[in-house]
Amino acid sequence: MKMRIQGNAIRFRLNRTEVGEFETVGKVGASIGFPGGRKLSYSLEKGGEAMGAAFDGDTIRVRVPEALAREWTGTDRVSIHEQAQGLEVIIEKDFQCLHKGEEGKDPAAYPNPMALA
């Protein structure tokens, strides 16, 4: 799962494997380790009545209501884009890169519709 933070927005991109885990388990997450043993964890979770996000000092959690999560995982819908308590939250299915280099290649990424054109 990829995370991008820009301005007052957070974006998660999930490949097919991660979307499947989110669909069946109800949660998917990742973390990055820093020197000195500290780490930042982030997760996408089903639950709540409205989309929301929380940060507790070392973990970012984004919640998606069950019905919205089911629609996103079970259809061709590419993204969820919501304002959650003043924070822009974007959840996307991750597409394969169009450039030819090895960097960023993920065999579990969704086929890029632009590559089929």
Regions found by a protein language model. Name each.
Residues 40, 73-92, 97-104, 108-110, ...:
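Phosphate/adenylate-binding glycine loop and adjacent helical scaffold
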Residues 1-3, 51:
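Residue-level detector of beta-strand structural context in well-folded domains
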